[in-house]
């Protein structure tokens, strides 16, 4: 049938007249129950959905309504009951539904005796049949025939029951002429209620005939025990024969008249055929608890963590095992929480997942006063996010949107989110619509700003995960990583050794040009960071026995006549030598050191000199240089470079 115009104001008037304390929502499905119209006095139904917004969430200038191709179920759908003319003012071009859908709950032909909607069924009249197509008419006649057949069967069954009751009444009235004694029939001539004198009753032997001359059928053993409760029973032996009865007979008293017939035994009731068979009780659906636990994990041991745990995994649980009824959701929740003491829920608490979380939260945390709601929601937002905090706040505050929004607004991640949320929420028609669409708006804004569900930056999370993956190694690669680290450390040690040797050569080269650097004064200092600290400070690399030999090989043409400036900082090797001498020896110029190095070079040509020997020689040379003048020739055995 397509879309049609909707008059929202008339729809609101219908809601108010029917006592519905709310406003219609976007995409709400409503059942219309039309009480009479152009088709006649019968009741007809149609299921419609209303549209108040477009796809972007903006209000429509002209709201629309659209018929749904489903039957109306008043027990499930929100149903509006009014005459067809009044409903047509709100829903333009309103008409009955197509086919058998116009019968509403009876669209499938299931007529239930005693049901309100079944008892008001009216078959289509001539004016309604005239508007039907051939296929539609055949379908309606089929369903109408089924309903009429069920009604006829019910009438026949009730007629049989009425005839049975009449027969029982006639049988009971026919027994009023007979006394209810087992195995005996009263003479038809004796009227009911006629007094019988006790003196006429004589003891009857077993072989004699009955008082009614019934050929000896009756015997005292056949007395019905129920007759003993009668105040005066002439068929029991009297006190005259000495046997006595249940109640002594008083001869002087007049015979009592039977006021009524004694109660008859209940007749065997005829089986009543129930036409409408009760629907079979559906077998309880098996819950795949193992599959659900594979997604959610184990239940938290702390009961206070259970509500938020269920709230986080509600979507995953619905994905594994969809739940359509509160009863089924209640069974799943109780199975997950494992019957914890005091946490078992009823179906009334499991209308949706928000109600489940709210009920469990109140049970585990207690009922909070309203002035502490801000602290509760702040803790929930910090742990679970704004969306979860909003849902819980709505439940705990009894749908107070303004209170919850005022608490959560300062907790949003940034002014951009606050502005965007306020702009979108202001476009909603009322607080109920804002509550319904809050999470949708929040997720859209988070996605637009590049934030995750908790308002955190996605780029930061990705960088953190990338660094974490690069820092961590997979299982099975630990041995390979250890080997790589060992090889890398060995290469670094080799590289440092080579750099140390190269640094020694560079130091020797700078010593050869020390005179020129001394002339520059302070400008000649080497300001690069010192790799090794002097040994007098506890540092240093130590010396090898062949370090001097390597220095001489690297600098064979160094002259000993070039003076060194006292302001020049000694090199690491020279500092190593000076640390073993006295303070006066360290104050001399570099001429003595040059002669000492030359003497060691000549000595190394003939034999290997120990480090201790070289140190002793250098110490004695430095002492002799301190006692003498600067022009004193070196000790014997030393050679000048010019020689």
UniProtKB/Swiss-Prot annotation:
Chain segments carrying region GR-box 2: 523-544
Where in this protein does the record put region Disordered? 180-219, 232-254, 460-643
Superkingdom of this entry's organism?
Viruses
Q: Where is this region: GR-box 3?
A: 575-607
PTM comment for this protein?
A: Specific enzymatic cleavages in vivo by viral protease yield mature proteins. The protease is not cleaved off from Pol. Since cleavage efficiency is not optimal for all sites, intermediary molecules are expressed.
Q: Would you name any one GO CC term?
A: host cell
As annotated in the record, motif Nuclear localization signal runs over: 523-544
Q: Where is this region: Involved in viral assembly and export?
A: 31-54
* Regions of compositional bias (Polar residues) in chain numbering: 633-643
Key word RNA-binding present: yes
Here the segments flagged for biased composition (Gly residues) are 515-524
- Keyword DNA-binding found: yes
Q: Where is the composition biased (Low complexity)?
A: 198-211, 461-474, 481-514, 547-572, 603-632
Q: Where is this region: Nucleic acid-binding?
A: 468-493
Per its record, what are the GO molecular function terms? DNA binding; RNA binding
- Which Gene Ontology BP terms does the record give? microtubule-dependent intracellular transport of viral material towards nucleus; symbiont entry into host cell; viral budding via host ESCRT complex; viral release from host cell
Q: Which UniProt keywords apply?
A: Capsid protein, Cytoplasmic inwards viral transport, DNA-binding, Host cytoplasm, Host nucleus, Host-virus interaction, Microtubular inwards viral transport, RNA-binding, Viral budding, Viral budding via the host ESCRT complexes, Viral nucleoprotein, Viral release from host cell, Virion, Virus entry into host cell
| Chain ranges for the short sequence motif PTAP/PSAP motif as given in the UniProt record | 251-254
Q: Where is this site: Cleavage?
A: 293-294, 321-322, 334-335, 610-611
- Role summary: Involved in capsid formation and genome binding. Shortly after infection, interaction between incoming particle-associated Gag proteins and host dynein allows centrosomal targeting of the viral genome (associated to Gag), prior to nucleus translocation and integration into host genome.
Q: Domain note for this entry?
A: Gag protein contains 3 glycine-arginine motifs (GR-boxes) necessary for RNA packaging, the first of which has nucleic acid binding properties in vitro.
Additional facts recorded = Foamy viruses are distinct from other retroviruses in many respects. Their protease is active as an uncleaved Pro-Pol protein. Mature particles do not include the usual processed retroviral structural protein (MA, CA and NC), but instead contain two large Gag proteins. Their functional nucleic acid appears to be either RNA or dsDNA (up to 20% of extracellular particles), because they probably proceed either to an early (before integration) or late reverse transcription (after assembly). Foamy viruses have the ability to retrotranspose intracellularly with high efficiency.
* Protein name per UniProt: Gag polyprotein
What is the protein's species of origin? Simian foamy virus type 3 (strain LK3) (SFVagm)
